[in-house]
Regions:
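Short, surface-exposed charged micro-motifs
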Residues: 71-72, 97, 132
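Short beta-strand His + acidic residue motifs that chelate non-heme Fe in jelly-roll/DSBH
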Residues: 82-84, 106-108, 125-126, 130-137, ...
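Tight coil/turn sites that cap or link beta-strands
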Residues: 77-79, 120, 128
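Non-heme Fe(II)/2-oxoglutarate
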Residues: 1-66
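Short connector loops at helix/strand junctions that flank enzyme active sites
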Residues: 67, 76-78, 91-95, 101-103
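A short hydrophobic beta-strand segment most commonly corresponding to one strand
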Residues: 93-99, 122-124, 138-151
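Conserved short histidine dyad/triad with adjacent acidic residue
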Residues: 72-90
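A short beta-strand-loop-beta hairpin characteristic of the jelly-roll/cupin
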Residues: 99-118
Length: 151
């Protein structure tokens, strides 16, 4: 996994550090991914506003594009996201992953490439390719993600 940019995520990490993920409504997906329901009174709007700075800095790399659909993904220790591809993703869209918390055993698998996405970096992911996550560590793996689309 090769990052395309460094990004300061300290304020986002500080904000999510006070969250008890078990308090958030969640969607339990196949493979055990914990996906907080982000559009709730429990704080997405506060978090979403904090992402504006990060998104603006990273969008400088994408001329003639706009950001679309911001998300937060949490994979708890010992849980995985099964191998899949996002069939509905259009060819002119890419996803930016911004790790907020991770560990050396939180693996991202994309086709036949496997690695750890490190906080403080931003990564491009073509979600039409087969991808999966396995968090074999003892801390949550939390990623802020957003899609980039051509205008």
């Amino acid at each position: 996994m090769i990052p395309f940019a460094a990004v300061d995520v300290a304020d986002l990490v500080e904000w999510i550090g006070g969250i008890d993920w078990m308090d958030w409504p969640q969607q339990n997906l196949p493979g055990g991914e914990l996906k907080p329901a982000m559009m709730t009174d429990l704080g997405w709007h506060g978090f979403g506003a904090r992402t504006d700075r990060v998104v603006a800095a990273l969008m400088a790399y994408f001329h003639g594009c706009e950001d679309h659909q911001r998300m937060l993904s949490v994979v708890m220790p010992g849980h995985s996201i099964e191998s899949h591809r996002d069939e509905q993703a259009p060819a002119w869209q890419t996803r930016v992953h911004v790790p907020l918390t991770s560990n050396d055993r939180a693996l991202f698998i994309l086709d036949n490439d496997m690695g750890v996405m490190r906080p403080g970096n931003a990564y491009l992911v073509d979600t039409r390719a087969v991808h999966a996550v396995h968090n074999g560590g003892d801390t949550p793996r939390t990623h802020f993600m957003f899609d980039v689309r051509q205008q």
